[in-house]
Swiss-Prot record:
Protein name per its UniProtKB record: UPF0280 protein MJ1526
InterPro entries reported in the protein's UniProt record: ApbE-like_sf, MA1715-like, UPF0280
Similarity-based family: Belongs to the UPF0280 family.
Species for this entry: Methanocaldococcus jannaschii (strain ATCC 43067 / DSM 2661 / JAL-1 / JCM 10045 / NBRC 100440)
Coiled-coil zones: none
Length: 244
């Protein structure tokens, strides 16, 4: 059995699904701790918040700060591009649940001993709610990240035009930063050029397994992505979790 709770702390809005509801209180403590450490670091180092480029941090910086800095360096973006994925990753890392999914604004970190299907939300594209990704239990038995960036959905800054760029990686912080970088590159005269530019950008980023790009009703795929499945559910990414 799975239990669900939405945890909202300032900008953090996490939908948590876990196999034991006894983890909810600990989850709130972990989120709050990491947010406070990040906020305190930003007060002393405001450039960490505003930079669109990688930022070097001290070896003794808080773990979440170091995680975000590494993700930003790998994807060649500012560290805050990975904040949602990083908070979700720190949560999964510090909870001992065998089956746990944390969705933070469309960025997902999970660990499970069962197959999980995650739905895709790509704005007004016809693909929204029609397809999902089946993540095999062998792939997600340890921490795994599935993060999506969009130029047409949400309030995050994007310089691209893709409706959705979904990245799969063994770190949700890295997946989040990579999704931002790849989405930023999705520019061009038509859908095909936008997708090709996004796929070329993905070639520059290490430590990601694969990407799925949606521009209107066209898609592009690079690397290894989970099995695509038909969902027939017009529902946002994060609310659709089918567990087997």
């Amino acid at each position: 059995m799975w239990f669900k709770k939405r945890i909202i702390i300032k900008e953090t809005n996490i939908l948590l699904k876990v196999d034991d509801k006894g983890y909810f209180k600990k989850a709130e403590e972990i989120i709050l701790k990491n947010r406070l450490e990040l906020e305190r670091y930003i007060l002393k180092n405001p450039y960490f918040l505003t930079s669109y480029f990688p930022v070097d941090v001290e070896d003794d910086a808080p773990e979440i700060v170091r995680l975000m800095a590494i993700a930003g360096e790998i994807a060649n973006v500012g560290p805050m591009a990975s904040v949602a994925g990083a908070i979700a990753e720190m949560l999964i890392k510090n909870l001992n649940a065998k089956n746990i999914i944390a969705e933070n604004g469309g960025d997902i970190c999970l660990r499970a001993k069962k197959d999980v299907i995650i739905g895709l939300y790509a704005g007004n594209s016809k693909i929204t709610g029609e397809v999902g990704f089946r993540l095999k239990k062998e792939k997600i038995k340890n921490i795994y990240g599935v993060c999506t960036s969009s130029a047409t959905v949400g309030h995050s800054v994007s310089f691209g035009e893709a409706d959705a760029v979904t990245v799969f990686a063994k770190s949700s912080a890295i997946a989040d930063a990579a999704a931002t970088a790849i989405c930023n590159a999705s520019r061009g005269r038509d859908e095909e050029e936008m997708i090709n530019n996004a796929l070329e950008k993905a070639d520059e980023i290490k430590k990601i397994d694969g990407i799925f790009v949606v521009v209107k009703d066209k898609v592009g795929i690079k690397g290894k992505i989970p099995e695509l499945v038909k969902t027939d559910k017009r529902i946002t990414l994060g609310e659709l979790f089918d567990i087997y």
